[in-house]
Structure formats: C-alpha cells, structure tokens
C-alpha cells in the first residue's frame, strides 16, 4: 500500500468521524476465563486461545504466556503498525524494521515480599531499528507521529481512567 492508497482508504473513515464524532468511539473488549485447575487465564484473542499464567519469576512453569510479556507484545504490535502506517503516509521508505520493547519489573512487589517495591513496570523502553534512506529530519517526524498516534503507547504513557468491579455469577 502506498501513501495514495492509504489516504483513499482512510478518507471516508476520517470524513465520517469529522461529521459524526460519536462514530469514532468504539469499545474494544478482551475476555478470559479463569482456569479451574491451574493458575492460568484463557484469553480469547479472536485468532486463537492464549493461556496466560504465572511468570517463572513468580513460580510459573513458563509454559503459559506472561501477561507482562503480552503487554509489551501489544505495544510492539501497535507501534509497528503505526510506524508503518505513518511511514507510508509521509512517504518514508522502509526497507525493513525491528520494533523492540523492554520493561523492568521488580517481582518483589507482585509477590508481596516488599510492600515498598512497586507492582508493575518501573520503566518501559521502546526502540525502532529501521533500514531506510530517509534523512534524519524525516525520521524525527516519523518517530514523533508514531508516538502521537500509537494507541497502546499513548494508553501506557497517559494512564487512562480505569474502574474495576466484581460480581457474583
């Protein structure tokens, strides 16, 4: 897909959202079932069943997916798609690219070993390694726009309002 095809594909969608802003609000959903046997949660991904369990650093076997890894994978996927889309739109040729996300966790927090230790990622690093002849000013713009438009990056960075409920079934 080139820049013209991307614009042609997105133009009617953008027009719709401009004329009807409420149409742009969509609720994405994820659902999982708690395993009755092991310490795991089966997540319906739409393509396959992903079973998440404890990370080996918290006593897991390593056979199930780690939710922390899944968060980083979602960031990599979203950032990669956004980067490619923006590169196409601003006509930055990408021969190849690698997107890497790393996050630092102190597992003492989630295990309740140290009440002062944070639960969750203390730091996340996102890196793009791109093979392109584009000049540095275009790469700077590409990075700026990728950060601006990546849904997962912006969600992690800005911490949305979140609510948690529990109900008996």
Language model: regions and residue ranges:
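Extended beta-strand/beta-hairpin segments
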Residues: 1-73, 85-169
